[in-house]
Amino acid sequence: MSAETQTRRSGILIITHGSSDLAADLAFSDLLFAELKEKYPEALVCQAYSAPKTLQRIDRERAQTPVNTIPEMLEYMKAEGVTDLYVLAANLNPCKKYFRVVGMIEPCRSSFRSVRISPPLLNSEDDPAEIAGVLGGILGEAANSNTDLIVLAAHTANEEITELWKPVLDQLQKDCAVPIRLIFHNGKPGFSDLLSDLCTAGKSQNIVVVPMMLFGGRHLQKDLMAEEGSLSAMLKEAGHTVTVSLKGLGEYPVIRELFYKRNF
């Protein structure tokens, strides 16, 4: 962000899906908020949540930073004299959640002199090798010399998201000696596809599961780590040794720095 933009009463609105798990929020969205306030002290930095369920669940009184809806923050920033608005839509990929945010911002363009909306980290414009390099460092931290398989566990897939992941996975596999699989909780290939392939292979494996989710919170705990019905539970029942990384991607400084590098 240039000094010229700063003098034009700029504002940065961070929008995340949010988590009702306050610790998960503190580890990602609240860090975005604090770090951007420090990086751009002349800008009005605000944050909002896009998920109605999160807003219903979260205790606003206990939150570390202000908890607001997107309309609330747009009205506030307009009232505070922001003319040039930059929206950091903090999403990993172009999912429904991302386009919901875009749909809420677009009608408000006339309220500001300029409005920019960030793309998700995984998109068709940026070099897939860049995000593969960042993820490779994270996988190296999660795996060890005994790891037989690294499973990247994402939440939701559609045709566009699956295509965007392909060159990233190709690069990751070139750089990693351990086989890597990407699966989705909602989408294909899913948990059952992984279990079927492992059954066909017919041997017990030492598996490391790394969540491809920005927040650690509810989905990680329930879908990947719960004692019953989770990916970890199903793999263990099939005879495999399983380690699940406890971090959401947004907890890694390199991921947050990639957001900043690409968008400011």
Feature annotation, model-predicted:
Residues 1-264:
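Active-site-proximal alpha-helix that buttresses catalytic centers in soluble enzyme cores
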